[in-house]
Amino acid sequence: MRILGIDPGLRVTGFGVIDVSGHQLAYVASGVIKTPTADLPTRLGTIYDGVSTLIREHTPDQAAIEKVFVNVNPQSTLLLGQARGAAICGLVSGGLPVAEYTALQLKQAVVGYGRATKEQMQEMVAQLLSLSGRPGTDAADALGMAICHAHGGNTLNTLGGIAPALAKKGLRVRRGRLVG
């Protein structure tokens, strides 16, 4: 299975592509989609086109993207949400199922600690994919998103989806884990 991970951003959107066979992960590609200094619609179009090109070039089977977090600056949050929307439109237009994960879920799945630093993410991604060096921060987050989906993402989604039924039994999902 091939997974495309996306770390959305208005100026720079990171991408990472990995192959998954059982528990084995293999690096395929990573990098960034940079938008020009232009009006918002042009930048969003660049993100959409970039994601569409990635799908044509790498033919992924699934995609994973980071959920938007609420920033202290509401304007920044809105712009990030629009960039994320452009990326999701590109993914869906390419026929991919799209999974969404929070930054906390991403870091927990890749590093084992939800408050991991950018450097810790870069190092762990490099180790998990046997890279000779650390990828850039945006590419590392995108590769991490793909790794999160490959390893624990499906479990996190399943637990989240059955949370109402678990609550009736006195159980709940906390930080991606089942607790009583």
Curated annotation (Swiss-Prot):
Family the UniProt entry places it in: Belongs to the RuvC family.
InterPro entries linked: RNaseH-like_sf (IPR012337), RNaseH_sf (IPR036397), X-over_junc_endoDNase_Mg_BS (IPR020563), X-over_junc_endoDNase_RuvC (IPR002176)
Catalytic activity annotation: Endonucleolytic cleavage at a junction such as a reciprocal single-stranded crossover between two homologous DNA duplexes (Holliday junction)
Record note on quaternary structure: Homodimer which binds Holliday junction (HJ) DNA. The HJ becomes 2-fold symmetrical on binding to RuvC with unstacked arms; it has a different conformation from HJ DNA in complex with RuvA. In the full resolvosome a probable DNA-RuvA(4)-RuvB(12)-RuvC(2) complex forms which resolves the HJ.
Cofactor(s) required for function per UniProt: Mg(2+)
Enzyme Commission identifier(s): 3.1.21.10
GO cellular component, one term: cytoplasm
Record: residues binding Mg(2+) 2: 66
Species this protein is from: Burkholderia pseudomallei (strain 668)
Protein name: Crossover junction endodeoxyribonuclease RuvC
